[in-house]
């Protein structure tokens, strides 16, 4: 017990010296948090020190492994499984772009396990808007899991699948600033997707998150941040990408001006309250949103389609996503999920 008690101040000292934790140390720390072994004062100091130092890929990977193992899920027996969960936290108040993307990708025939929560950034999280559109957030876990095979998409409401994380809620609420937990959500999907698109709230996180995904064994991923400040690919400025493919991470820049898209400022992508965002999502998935709304979803869906291996390049992915949106197939997929989770 003394040995464990001595460990936490040791880890804090290491972080204050601006030395990153190893993956093993990060696992120890997360286990300590979940088992309520770390004193509150030390926990707060560790979270602040991590944030001040800058989170490393190894710290993210180590903590994510523990949280995934502690979740109520387990891997699905599928060779291809995609998630489009981002970090949120960009503060831009856009409509739920990555949520719309999930239904486009599913309508393309790719199994999707969308992991999400209530709002972390602007006004409306994926769980908020999907609940407003009729998705049962309280469906039984086995029903949620079965939706992947039966519908082609499911939604995992994070608090239902991560009961162990209740242990860390007091630290997060007390600090009222961003912590490593804001980054862990997209990495701990309980159904273990092997391919992901993750938007992050800061450019410097792109290579860090991409490397964390590599350490966690993902087969393919794109991590992105738009220079407009979005955790999505926008229609005004280039987007920085960290691409994980073949076990290697490379960086690229995606310029919307190169792809015959509707170029538009962030203002054109704004959402509102839950009802407004639900209305926008309905229009977009039915193919009747504004040109900017339709195209920002098509662009971000193209990234996911390429990660999934069904689009040879972004241009082809954009065309495929536009066609899916135009015929209302993504809306049909949402209605199928609503019906299945209510049964």
UniProtKB/Swiss-Prot annotation:
Family stated for the protein in its record: Belongs to the anthranilate phosphoribosyltransferase family.
GO biological process: L-tryptophan biosynthetic process
Binding site for Mg(2+) 2: 231-232
GO CC list: cytosol
Binding site for Mg(2+) 1: 98, 232
Keyword Nucleus: no
Required cofactor names: Mg(2+)
Residues where anthranilate 1 binds: 86, 117
Subunit structure: Homodimer.
Cofactor, how bound (note): Binds 2 magnesium ions per monomer.
Catalytic activity annotation: N-(5-phospho-beta-D-ribosyl)anthranilate + diphosphate = 5-phospho-alpha-D-ribose 1-diphosphate + anthranilate
Protein name as it appears in the record: Anthranilate phosphoribosyltransferase
Residues where anthranilate 2 binds: 172
Function text: Catalyzes the transfer of the phosphoribosyl group of 5-phosphorylribose-1-pyrophosphate (PRPP) to anthranilate to yield N-(5'-phosphoribosyl)-anthranilate (PRA).
Binding positions (5-phospho-alpha-D-ribose 1-diphosphate): 86, 89-90, 94, 96-99, 114-122, 126
MF terms (GO), sorted A to Z: anthranilate phosphoribosyltransferase activity; magnesium ion binding
Enzyme Commission code(s) on record: 2.4.2.18
Keyword Transferase on entry: yes
Source organism, top-level taxon: Bacteria
Assigned keywords, A-Z: Amino-acid biosynthesis, Aromatic amino acid biosynthesis, Glycosyltransferase, Magnesium, Metal-binding, Transferase, Tryptophan biosynthesis
InterPro entries the UniProt entry points to: Anthranilate_Pribosyl_Tfrase, Glycosyl_Trfase_fam3, Glycosyl_Trfase_fam3_N_dom, Glycosyl_Trfase_fam3_N_dom_sf, Nuc_phospho_transferase
Pathway linked to the protein: Amino-acid biosynthesis; L-tryptophan biosynthesis; L-tryptophan from chorismate: step 2/5
